[in-house]
């Protein structure tokens, strides 16, 4: 058996091939797992659990079917879907996790997260993140009419795209000191995260020993998952 990790699907109605690929994954590989962890940015945008978008209901039903089959499903918020709430979690059968979670997997101590908090060189993004994660601001936003939230979200995505176009790739990647600090804080040898869309397995030193950072890929033209078993930790890419 294996525990599976995925992230950065950025599901939206404009990308039906990714949706179809995810549905096949849920109906196939996911059903064989000990557990499924989704490490953020499952959706391209999330403006509230009350959004009647048919895609959201379709995904909730598909994930719920995996959960009902006996495979526990867990979710860590990403920077795109940090407003995903308890209602959708209940409808999909997912358990919401904190932004950093330590797992004991087949004798390994593994830290999981979305990964955006590691990009500390991007001061502009970190300031924005701190602002939009304020509970009072989220409550205020979610109280707005749906059409207003849609307009605000569209403007924010446009602003983000424009800002990122002028940033260096190095700034938008993780900060090595932040990585080591997180791993040493939690006393782990393994870290699995997404966000950067740069799939790789990195070897480093943390806690005075060899450690590993595994970065999930985004689902653009193919699927990406990390498969953890008693024998191995694999970063796997597969066709939709």
From Swiss-Prot:
Amino acids binding substrate: 79-80, 122, 160, 164, 167, 195
GO molecular function: manganese ion binding; UDP-2,3-diacylglucosamine hydrolase activity
Reactions the enzyme catalyzes: UDP-2-N,3-O-bis[(3R)-3-hydroxytetradecanoyl]-alpha-D-glucosamine + H2O = 2-N,3-O-bis[(3R)-3-hydroxytetradecanoyl]-alpha-D-glucosaminyl 1-phosphate + UMP + 2 H(+)
Keyword Cell membrane annotated: yes
Main location: membrane
Keywords: Cell inner membrane, Cell membrane, Hydrolase, Lipid A biosynthesis, Lipid biosynthesis, Lipid metabolism, Manganese, Membrane, Metal-binding
Cell inner membrane found in the keyword field: yes
An example Gene Ontology biological process: lipid A biosynthetic process
Cofactor note: Binds 2 Mn(2+) ions per subunit in a binuclear metal center.
Enzyme class: hydrolase
Binding residue positions for Mn(2+) 1: 8, 10, 41, 197
Disulfide bonds: none
Gene3D superfamilies linked: 3.60.21.10
Residues annotated as binding Mn(2+) 2: 41, 79, 114, 195
Biological or metabolic pathway of the protein: Glycolipid biosynthesis; lipid IV(A) biosynthesis; lipid IV(A) from (3R)-3-hydroxytetradecanoyl-[acyl-carrier-protein] and UDP-N-acetyl-alpha-D-glucosamine: step 4/6
Family to which the UniProt record says this protein belongs: Belongs to the LpxH family.
Functional description taken from the UniProt entry: Hydrolyzes the pyrophosphate bond of UDP-2,3-diacylglucosamine to yield 2,3-diacylglucosamine 1-phosphate (lipid X) and UMP by catalyzing the attack of water at the alpha-P atom. Involved in the biosynthesis of lipid A, a phosphorylated glycolipid that anchors the lipopolysaccharide to the outer membrane of the cell.
Name of the protein in question: UDP-2,3-diacylglucosamine hydrolase
